[in-house]
Curated annotation (Swiss-Prot):
Function: With S4 and S12 plays an important role in translational accuracy.
One protein family per Pfam: Ribosomal_S5
Domain remark from Swiss-Prot or TrEMBL: The N-terminal domain interacts with the head of the 30S subunit; the C-terminal domain interacts with the body and contacts protein S4. The interaction surface between S4 and S5 is involved in control of translational fidelity.
Record-given protein name: Small ribosomal subunit protein uS5
Subunit structure: Part of the 30S ribosomal subunit. Contacts protein S4.
Biological classification of the source: Archaea, Methanobacteriati, Methanobacteriota, Stenosarchaea group, Methanomicrobia
Source organism, top-level taxon: Archaea
S5 DRBM domain sequence ranges: 49-112
Organism for this UniProt entry: Methanocorpusculum labreanum (strain ATCC 43576 / DSM 4855 / Z)
Family to which this protein belongs: Belongs to the universal ribosomal protein uS5 family.
GO cellular component terms, semicolon-separated: cytosolic small ribosomal subunit
Keywords: Ribonucleoprotein, Ribosomal protein, RNA-binding, rRNA-binding
């Protein structure tokens, strides 16, 4: 889903460095360890990002002045080549909730380590995950296991959308908990992908 972007005027030190061209790649920004607090930084360094709205929920709350309704949007973004982000946004307008979710996802973008971790394959290409990883959110746990080339994404539709935008083509997926909850299923899948960059090959962090 495409939204017209406003002209970005950086306000943080990192944003000003990006605008000045001091970073050659997004990897350099991540390696610097500086927190990303502006979505414009991500837009500037990863212009090929695609966003996918996973669900929109109506939330009601009773107040002294009556019932108030807000919408919650859950969004995943990625460039289908090793970067993925997950975000939520709330607002009284659906469109604004989606925009907030996209911005939140950009601030939560992570690099996904890909590889060929299946003993059945060994092609050496970056089509799967390099090791088994698990992510959790609420009652949901999602475990990603390396799969040989050609297997595809063995998971539900929500998981497929998250994995596809991350650039994963083949993976076995085990789940537990209430996976019918789109928010937790998507977030657990995202958290599992984030683990690929936190766990060293060999199993130790």
């Amino acid at each position: 889903m495409a939204y017209e972007q406003e002209v970005w005027v950086p306000v943080t030190g990192l944003g000003k460095k990006v605008m000045a061209g001091e970073f050659a790649s997004f990897d350099e920004i991540l390696a610097s360890g500086q927190p990303i607090k502006e979505a414009g930084i991500v837009d500037a360094m990863l212009p090929d990002l695609v966003d996918e709205v996973l669900c929109i929920d109506m939330m009601q709350r009773m107040t002294d002045s009556g019932r108030r309704i807000k919408f919650r949007a859950v969004v995943v973004i990625g460039n289908k080549n090793g970067y993925v982000g997950f975000g939520q946004g709330r607002d009284v307008q659906v469109g604004t909730a989606i925009k907030k979710a996209i911005t939140n996802a950009k601030l939560n973008i992570v690099k996904v380590r890909r590889g060929c971790g299946s003993w059945e394959c060994g092609c050496g290409m970056k089509h799967s995950v390099p090791m088994e990883v698990t992510g959790k959110a609420g009652s949901v746990a999602v475990t990603l296991k390396p799969a040989p080339k050609g297997i595809g994404l063995v998971t539900g539709d929500v998981g497929k959308k998250v994995l596809t935008l991350a650039g994963i083509q083949d993976v076995w997926v085990n789940t537990s908990g209430n996976t019918r909850t789109t928010l937790n299923f998507a977030k657990a899948t995202y958290n599992a992908l984030r683990e690929t960059n936190l766990i060293r090959i060999g199993g130790r962090k």
